[in-house]
Amino acid sequence: MRHRLIATIFSFIACFAVYAQDVCVINGKIADDKLANGKAIKKVFLTSADEYGRRTVVAEAKVKKGSYTFKYKVSADAPVMQYTITGFDNEKGIKLFVEPGTVAVNTATAQNPCQSKLSGTPTNDLYEEYKQIDINADEKVAKAVEALAQQNGKEWLESKEGKQEVKRIEATERIKREADRIRFLIDHNASPMTPLEMECRVMPYLSNAYAEQMMKSVYTPLQKHPYYQSFRNAVLARNIKVGNEVPDIAITLRDGKTVKLNDNRGKYILLDFWASTCEKSMQNRNTLKELYQATKEEQDKFVIVSLSLDSDKNAWGDTLDNNGLALDGWLQGNNTMGTESIAAKQFGVKKTPHMILIDPEGRAISLNMEADEVQMRVEQILEGDLYYLDQSKE
């Protein structure tokens, strides 16, 4: 009896320890585990995605008789993020949020994993409720079209008048659906799901001013979350002009460390997009070296941030070394995505060179400057005589 009691106590301690480590347990059940090729799915993968949608497998699980389990440890300070369970046909997957607790994933068929139902943790329960908005809207459209068919006949639906009426019904429900989404997200503005959905699903339908109001509606403590930062950058990128705040882009340095543009708040920043394969960019290196020498004692006031769009990191590094550009305090970053990178797109960079001057509050002073304007503007900064037209209220 005593041994059994001790074993029970140790079992309880072990279970408690698992949850004390912030583990996300995902229990999946697939009713019909047959893929399109007729074979049963054997393995699934838990994948994360970067800002470009590139997936990384973080865990895998065997599927036995339609069941699988992931036990994924979540660090105590990790934000709640969306992952995807993959391994199904045509790169389809099950989107869910990884957070401490147990998530139940019920999938009717392996051929359509997107229709899976989630339950068990706060964000996933809320996400399932949010997805119901789409389901309800689709059902309303289907019922309305069916009512038209019963009233006028199915052949009438194929007529010009019938098709126009179906389009009217679909457009009406689409507007109602977007309104329901906005209302839902505002009502649940403290969920990490909210800024993600605001950016991906809602913002494309909003004006710049409305998108900015949506951004401001997010719960203040959530504003350090990566999804909020991404949403905020997307909103700011829509309206870049002199006097407006610019996006807070990430810059990967040569040593692999990532810094943010806003890490230099309180200083004037020269943001310099360039490429070693661009002749004019290389000509500007000499101007910027002279500028660096003239301002290196003023790095508490002014900093140069150069973001290379070279696709070849080695070529970029060689260019820095061969041209004496690896200098203390001159931030040199690289983005191998070129003009397709998020940073380039958010700043509207179509080609290099592209230089932007930013004030200590993170607002644009000058956009797409030539080298001579850069020199003039920096002289104004050092002399305390900088001026620019504030267009943010126009």
What are these regions (language model features)?
Residues 1-25:
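Bacterial Sec-dependent N-terminal signal peptides
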Residues 21-172:
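A non-transmembrane, solvent-exposed segment enriched in polar/low-complexity residues
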Residues 91, 103-104, 110-113, 117, ...:
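N-terminal targeting signals for export/organelle localization
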Residues 229-261, 331, 377-387, 392-394:
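N-terminal "domain-start" segment that seeds a small globular fold
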Residues 249, 353-367:
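A short, hydrophobic beta-strand/beta-hairpin element that forms part of a small beta-sheet core
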Residues 265-266, 273-290, 311:
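Conserved redox-active cysteine motifs that mediate thiol-disulfide chemistry
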Residues 283-307, 380-386:
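Conserved helix-turn-beta segment immediately C-terminal to the redox Cys motif
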Residues 317-353:
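Short, internal strand/loop/helix patches
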